[in-house]
Amino acid sequence: MARPLKLRWALAGLAGLTLLRLALAAWLPLSPDEAYYWVWSRALAPGYLDHPPMVAYWIWIGTHLLGETALGVRLLGPLAAAGGSLLLGQAAEDFWPGKGAGPIAAALLNATLLFGAGSVIMTP
């Protein structure tokens, strides 16, 4: 019974962290690089001068869902971070079954500064 409770707490923590990241994504002004990539999203191409197109595609999706706002530009960053945390947690559980490694692996990933900043700022 203790393991499902730990998993629920881990998922609740991840949901709260994702909501915090979405709030920060909406509140922080866009960086010059993000504005540059937003321009890319207005004319999608299979590639750009110095980067592959994924950031432009993600910004295009976000701005079509939420409009041309800071949150629209950054929407998929925090959502992808949550998805990546879930995938890493499942991989850790598969690698070390029965040891509760999934929530620990996801927590360690989310504790890194670069992952936290990179999940809010939409740059490649």
Predicted features along the sequence, with ranges:
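Loop-to-helix entry region of an early transmembrane alpha helix in multi-pass inner-membrane enzymes
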Residues: 53-57, 67-86, 102, 118
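Short acidic/glycine- and proline-prone juxtamembrane loop motifs at membrane-interface regions
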Residues: 120-124
